[in-house]
């Protein structure tokens, strides 16, 4: 019998604690072993049972989540998923938490439409499973499919002809998930100011991507911004897909631009790496350079294979530097990867491929 992932929920809202408990109780892989209204109660709970994953609110009375997180990571590291409200302060605190060692960010569940609750449940459960795998690499529980895992066909039909206009301008597409916030910082800070245009999908909740892009923009030599529909791809700039919208690469004449679109979850995600990669295969072909980075699941693997078949240069982050070696591993297994490299070597390899 598959081993349950033990979850401890720490949030000062009784409604949030109950909602999360209900969500996890519906997934056979997850088991709530305790709830706590603040970090002091959480410590008491952990004296009797050690969880595999802690779901942690940031803003709490008596001791805030960031202080508790730092204590956990310094004394007894446990994978932590930050459960944050959608506010500017919440987003900033969440990214601070990622710097302190948290592995995922999720948006607090809220009562809304049936579709929102279903999709929110999928994302929350997947985030906890990914966090557990970041430490428990040998975890072998069979994935519980809540909804069908759609392919990129749901957003962009496969291109039978693959008639890509040949151009000399290169464009870079990148996909990441669990552990990607820190990995993308390392990648983009190493990019030269005149680097080729970059489009990025990082699995992240709605409203958090703008703050994430802003933080990167303040530390990188290139411009980093959340993508808007119709943005033209420019050298020295990286565009990050908005949370809850798919990002597609398009071309008009000699210019690349991006399109942001609503649509179903693809590979259980929106935005989806597969959607971005398929659009790059269609509109850039062998003028694209693609990188797939740390993350759980298989989003991006099929799209990278399509890019590889058009002649694009494809790179996967290696297992040693991934928080979760899921997405890169699936891409390698499909045979769509030209090179497997450590995180610190990705930027130079991308620039070299674009200049060759």
From Swiss-Prot:
It catalyses: [protein]-L-glutamate 5-O-methyl ester + H2O = L-glutamyl-[protein] + methanol + H(+); L-glutaminyl-[protein] + H2O = L-glutamyl-[protein] + NH4(+). GO terms for cellular component: cytoplasm. The modification 4-aspartylphosphate is found at residue 57. Residues 6-123 form the Response regulatory domain. It is an enzyme of class 3 (hydrolase). It is found in: Cytoplasm. It comes from the Bacteria. Coiled coil: none annotated. Keywords: Chemotaxis, Cytoplasm, Hydrolase, Phosphoprotein. GO terms for molecular function: phosphorelay response regulator activity; protein-glutamate methylesterase activity; protein-glutamine glutaminase activity. Its main location: cytoplasm. The keyword Signal does not apply. The keyword Cytoplasm applies. The active site is at residues 177, 203, 299. Pfam families: CheB_methylest, Response_reg. Contains a C-terminal catalytic domain, and an N-terminal region which modulates catalytic activity. Belongs to the CheB family. This is Protein-glutamate methylesterase/protein-glutamine glutaminase 2.
């Amino acid at each position: 019998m598959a081993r349950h992932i033990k979850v401890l929920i720490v949030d000062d809202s009784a409604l949030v604690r109950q909602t999360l408990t209900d969500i996890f109780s519906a997934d056979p892989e997850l088991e709530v072993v305790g709830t706590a209204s603040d970090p002091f109660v959480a410590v008491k709970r952990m004296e009797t049972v050690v969880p595999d994953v802690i779901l942690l609110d940031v803003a709490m009375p008596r001791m805030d989540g960031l202080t508790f997180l730092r204590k956990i990571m310094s004394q007894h590291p446990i994978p932590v998923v930050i459960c944050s409200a959608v506010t500017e302060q919440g987003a900033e605190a969440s990214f601070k938490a990622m710097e302190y060692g948290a592995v995922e960010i999720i948006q607090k569940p809220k009562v809304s439409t049936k579709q929102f609750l279903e999709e929110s449940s999928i994302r929350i459960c997947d985030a906890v499973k990914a966090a557990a795998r970041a430490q428990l690499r040998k975890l072998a529980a069979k994935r519980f499919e809540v909804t069908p895992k759609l392919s990129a066909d749901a957003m962009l039909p496969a291109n039978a002809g693959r008639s890509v206009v040949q151009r000399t301008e290169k464009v870079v597409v990148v996909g990441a998930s669990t552990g990607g916030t820190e990995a993308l910082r390392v990648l983009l800070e190493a990019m030269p100011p005149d680097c080729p245009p970059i489009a990025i999908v990082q699995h992240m909740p709605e409203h958090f991507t703008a703050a994430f892009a802003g933080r990167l923009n303040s530390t990188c030599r290139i411009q980093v911004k959340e993508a808007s529909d119709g943005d033209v791809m420019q050298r020295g700039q990286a565009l990050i897909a908005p949370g809850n919208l798919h990002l597609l690469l398009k071309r008009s004449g000699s210019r690349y631009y991006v399109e942001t679109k609503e649509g179903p979850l693809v590979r259980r995600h929106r935005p989806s790496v597969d959607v971005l990669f398929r659009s790059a295969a269609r509109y850039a072909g062998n003028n694209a350079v693609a990188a797939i980075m740390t993350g759980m699941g298989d989003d991006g693997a099929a799209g990278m294979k399509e890019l590889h078949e058009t002649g694009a240069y494809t790179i996967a982050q290696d297992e040693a530097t991934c928080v979760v070696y899921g997405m890169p591993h699936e891409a390698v297994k499909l045979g769509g990867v030209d090179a497997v490299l450590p995180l610190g070597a990705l930027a130079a390899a991308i620039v070299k491929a674009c200049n060759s």
